[in-house]
């Protein structure tokens, strides 16, 4: 199973290369590293710094790129991106992390319960067997 961080990084790479080509994307990553001290590999862990750096470089174009990234990311997770007033790129990533953590916790809990029920049924059958 792919982590959210890995998926986000792949989506950022793909979107940037589609819009700015390979060379332009390298220039942007270099800018982020030199001006925001943000390495490409850190984008998923530091989305607010990524967003701030993109705004420094691209101005009003940054939110357009961020929205493209978010739409693709949500699509790959089979979720619908809900735009909210006052929400920024980093807010969406933070909320997505929470949603996925809740879903993971739910799946683990259900798995434990199902396993417990199976074990109880096996135990009941063993008691019945002479």
What are these regions (language model features)?
Residues 1-130:
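Long, compositionally biased intrinsically disordered regulatory segments in eukaryotic proteins
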